[in-house]
Amino acid sequence: YSGELWNYRRLCELNAVFYHNNTALLYLFPVDCFKAFRQVYILTYMFDAQVQRYYYNFYGAKFEYIGVAGDNVSNYHFVPELTVSDNEQFAKHITIEDGVTLNAIGEKPFSLSVSWYDKNIKTYSTGIKNNIYNFFHNKSKTPSNKNLWTVFKQYKSAIQGKGYAKSFLSCNARATNAYSDRTAVAYMCNIFFNPILKNFFEQKGVRIEEDKWALSELLQFLFRSGIRKGEDIRLYIPSLRMRNLLKRWMVGMYDDKIDPENQEQIPIENKLEKAKALIDKYNLNDTSSDA
């Protein structure tokens, strides 16, 4: 057989296609590719929140968390205990735009999500463009070559504007250092996990951490900017949901350490006390003003 369904046949033979709820065909990378190795090491951050953890849980793959110790490339090494990152060292480099006017568009839980843009892009495109321009021109006061912005790619043309049009980077960009000189960032997304994929995994008993997944995606994008080199950045993130996820991360309210056996979060001692101190130190309370 060599017809138009040939590719589907090939994937089915690899046991890589699933028919979900009589509505969708889902492709999952063949797990046998991982089983072919005696050991596989994955260097990543917030693994518990990522699709690949859901994938391994789905297939019943066994994994364990280990850490990395050392302070430079000459002495990095694996250690038995997971290394908990010190988010404070990054928090001190992030200034979040908390002005009421600029952030009003993102107050509702689903504002600036894909479904929200689908329904509202014609109504709000001019206002969003004005907000982004206002942020770069009047708040961060940065030249265009220091700006970085993102939105879901299908809406890029509708809201790109003067002074930042050429500074776009896809919100799911990975493995690029080309924007590590950017110090002003406009993040115009409110990210939610694909509902079909979420339902597929949950029906199979896989735990989905949607907020942590959204935070992981946000952090991946932010670390394309100058913060990856320890530079200060100014951030416009009008979605209240995404902004609060980031603020909680900044004060250590999320960590990546879980027990793979029962998948329960392992508490960190004194986390709340430390968080309160950092909230005061960095003025991270969500008391917005136009100042």
Question: Can you describe what each PLM-predicted range is?
Answer:
Residues 1-169:
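Positively charged, amphipathic N-terminal segments that serve as targeting/anchoring signals
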Residues 56-65, 235-267:
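C-terminal/domain-terminus segments
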Residues 65-69, 193-195, 209-213, 260-263:
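Glycine-rich loops and low-complexity Gly/Arg-rich segments
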Residues 69-76, 174-178, 193, 243, ...:
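A short acidic, often aromatic-flanked loop/helix-cap motif at beta-alpha or helix-coil junctions
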Residues 128, 214-217, 271:
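Alpha-helical structural motif
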Residues 138-139, 252, 256, 278-285:
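Surface-exposed polar/charged interaction patches
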Residues 163-245, 252:
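Conserved RecA-like P-loop NTPase helicase motor core
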Residues 265-291:
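BZIP DNA-binding basic region
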